[in-house]
Structure formats: C-alpha cells, structure tokens
UniProtKB/Swiss-Prot annotation:
Pathway terms, separated by semicolons: Cofactor biosynthesis; molybdopterin biosynthesis
Protein name: Cyclic pyranopterin monophosphate synthase
Stated family: Belongs to the MoaC family.
Gene coding for it: moaC
Source species of the chain: Brucella canis (strain ATCC 23365 / NCTC 10854 / RM-666)
Pfam families per the UniProt record, alphabetical: MoaC (PF01967)
GO biological processes: Mo-molybdopterin cofactor biosynthetic process
Keywords, ordered alphabetically: Lyase, Molybdenum cofactor biosynthesis
Length: 165
C-alpha cells in the first residue's frame, strides 16, 4: 500500500481516479454485515410473519439493486458494468440476528469493494426498516470487506471472516 490517498490531488481537491491505462482483470469483492435483534424479532422474520412482508427476500433484492447504483451514492466511484451481485442472508441465533454477505464481480479496471459494501449496507438497512416496528433496538454493525481478488497487488482476505468486531 502506498500510504497516499488516491482520490485527493496535490491541491487537496477531490478527484476521480483515472483507471483508463489499467488492464482489465476479473475482480471480485465480498463484504459482510450483521443486524442484531431480539430473538423474538428473528423468529418473526424467519417464520415470515413480519407486517411488511418477506424481510429476507426484500432485503436481498434491495442489496442487489444498491450495488448497481453505487456510483450514484458514493461521489467518486466509477460506474461499473457488474457481471454478478449476490447477497446471502443467514440467521444466527447466537447473535441473535441476521448475518449478511454480499459479493460483487466484474471484468474491469477498478475494484468492486464499494459495490459489495453498498450491497451489504443496504441489505442491513432494509432488514432494519422492515422490522423496526417490532424492534427499535436492532443494531447494524460489522460492515467490512472480507475478501478481494483480481488486483495487480494480489488477492486479499481477512484471517477470520466469521469474526464480528
């Protein structure tokens, strides 16, 4: 890592990084997050009895849609031609709550970690929105990139992707 911010020019102004001279490579990133909630809220969601409908299905779709709109939300992100976005939502009774994992993939000149992070974040936000009427104490957290591949500098992954900070 160079230790230099890439989105700031020599005058301190924000700028979009020029990736035009980079080679296209297969790139992938995976991000995770979690929504902690009361055990009763988790049960309600898993039973499909939430007042707003299918929480898991709706949240998955929201995450996929969000990944495709990342450059509209994050000012200096490049618009990307994603080839795959997948969102997994798994119950964790020990949390208690739902764990989210989002994957973004493309063949291109820049990474897709912001798209994976956006997918994971919006998935968690949608879960919160759909269940807030029954549990106002839900907590969204541990949103982070857990793996990245296709970079010139090599692949990267956290040592324990199941850990929660």
């Amino acid at each position: 890592m160079s230790g230099k911010l890439t989105h700031i020019d020599q005058t301190g102004a924000a700028n979009m990084v020029d990736v035009g001279s980079k080679d296209e490579t297969e790139r992938q990133a995976v991000a995770e997050g979690a929504v902690r909630m009361k055990p009763e809220t988790l049960a309600l969601i898993l039973e499909g009895n939430a007042a707003k409908g299918d929480v898991i299905g709706t949240a998955r779709l929201a995450g996929i849609m969000a990944a495709k709109r990342t450059s509209d939300l994050i000012p200096l992100c490049h618009p990307l031609m994603l080839t795959k976005v997948a969102v997994e939502i798994e119950p964790d009774e020990n949390l208690p709550g739902l764990r989210v994992r989002a994957l973004a993939r493309l063949k291109g000149r820049t990474g897709v970690e912001m798209e994976a992070l956006t997918a994971a974040s919006v998935t968690c936000l949608t879960i919160y929105d759909m269940a807030k009427a029954v549990d106002r104490h839900m907590e969204i957290g541990s949103i982070r990139v857990i793996e990245k591949s296709g970079r010139k500098s090599g692949d990267w992954a956290v040592s324990d992707p199941a850990s929660m900070r």
